[in-house]
From Swiss-Prot:
With S4 and S12 plays an important role in translational accuracy. Located at the back of the 30S subunit body where it stabilizes the conformation of the head with respect to the body. Belongs to the universal ribosomal protein uS5 family. The keyword Ribonucleoprotein applies. This is Small ribosomal subunit protein uS5. Keywords: Ribonucleoprotein, Ribosomal protein, RNA-binding, rRNA-binding. The keyword NADP does not apply. GO terms for cellular component: small ribosomal subunit. GO terms for biological process: translation. It comes from the Bacteria. Part of the 30S ribosomal subunit. Contacts proteins S4 and S8.
Length: 250
C-alpha cells in the first residue's frame, strides 16, 4: 500500500535534517561580551537650567546666532556646581554646561537642614544675604539663588539679593557665600589648633581678660582723677594763704 505523508510530517522531517548544521553553526558563533559602554550608570547629580539666551556674533559674512545656557548641578548632599555652555543648538549648549558644572563642584557645610550661620556672599556687583531658618520654614529665595540652594541640600533658609540681578553674578555670589561657611568645630580649630581643649580655651580667655584689665584707664576716668587732685590742692592751699595773710597783717 502507498503511504501518503501529510504536510506536518514532511516539515518535521525537514527540521530533523537541518538540526546538525545548526549545531555546527552554534559551535562557531561568537558570544558577545557585555561591554562597559552598554552599562547605564545612574548619575547622582541633578541638573537645573537657570537661563538660556540667544547670542550673536557679527562678522563680515553676517551674523551668526548661537545659544548660551547656564546650568546648576548638585547631589543634594553638600556638592554643587555651576557651568556655562554655548552651541548652535539648545541641547548641545545644555550638555556642555552640565559637563563644565560637574568639573567645578563646591562643597557646602550644612547644619541639619539649614546653614550654620549668617553670611553675605559677593561677586562683582552681585550680593546675596543668606540666613539660617527653623525646621519647616522652607527655602525663601528667588531667582538663580534658589536653584543653587535647592541642589546643595538646604531645605530651610532665608536668602535675599542686595545687588545686581545678573544670573551669573547672583549664582557666583551664592557659591562664594556657601563655600565660606564654617562649623563651630572648624572655627575652634583655626583659633586654638587642631588639639582643641576646653581648659586651654579657658586659659586663653583669662589671659585676654587680665591684659584688658591691666591696660590704661580710658580718658574720661583720667580727667576725673585730675580734677579731683586739683580740688584737693585748692582745699589745702586756702588755709595756708589765710595764715600767711594774717601773719603779714600783724
Amino acid at each position: 500500500m502507498n503511504v501518503v505523508e501529510t504536510s506536518s510530517e514532511m516539515n518535521s522531517n525537514v527540521e530533523k535534517a537541518s538540526t546538525p548544521k545548526q549545531e555546527n553553526n552554534k559551535r562557531f558563533e561568537r558570544k558577545s561580551r557585555p561591554s562597559s559602554r552598554q552599562k547605564v550608570v545612574k548619575d547622582e547629580f541633578e541638573e537645573k537650567v537657570v537661563t538660556i539666551r540667544r547670542v550673536t556674533k557679527v562678522t563680515k559674512g553676517g551674523r551668526h546666532f548661537r545659544f548660551a545656557a547656564v546650568v546648576v548641578v548638585g547631589n543634594k548632599k553638600g556638592l554643587v556646581g555651576m557651568g556655562t555652555g554655548k552651541a548652535n543648538e539648545v541641547p548641545e549648549a545644555i550638555k556642555k554646561a552640565i559637563k563644565e558644572a560637574k568639573k567645578n563642584l563646591v562643597s557646602v557645610t550644612l547644619r541639619n537642614t539649614t546653614v550654620p550661620h549668617e553670611v553675605l556672599g559677593t561677586f562683582g556687583a552681585g550680593k546675596i544675604l543668606i540666613k539660617p531658618a527653623k525646621v519647616g520654614t522652607g527655602i525663601i529665595a528667588g531667582g538663580p539663588a534658589r536653584a543653587v540652594i535647592e541642589l546643595s541640600g538646604i531645605s530651610d533658609v532665608y536668602a535675599k539679593s542686595l545687588g545686581s540681578n545678573n544670573a551669573i553674578n547672583m549664582i557666583r555670589a551664592t557659591f562664594e557665600g556657601l563655600s565660606s561657611m564654617q562649623t563651630l568645630k572648624r572655627v575652634q580649630e583655626l583659633r586654638y589648633g587642631k588639639t582643641f581643649d576646653k581648659q586651654k580655651v579657658a586659659l586663653v580667655e583669662k589671659t585676654a581678660e587680665t591684659k584688658n584689665f591691666e591696660k590704661k584707664p580710658p580718658k574720661s576716668t583720667t580727667k576725673k582723677m585730675a580734677s579731683k587732685k586739683i580740688e584737693k590742692e585748692d582745699v589745702i592751699a586756702e588755709p595756708m594763704i589765710k595764715n600767711e595773710a594774717e601773719n603779714s597783717a600783724e
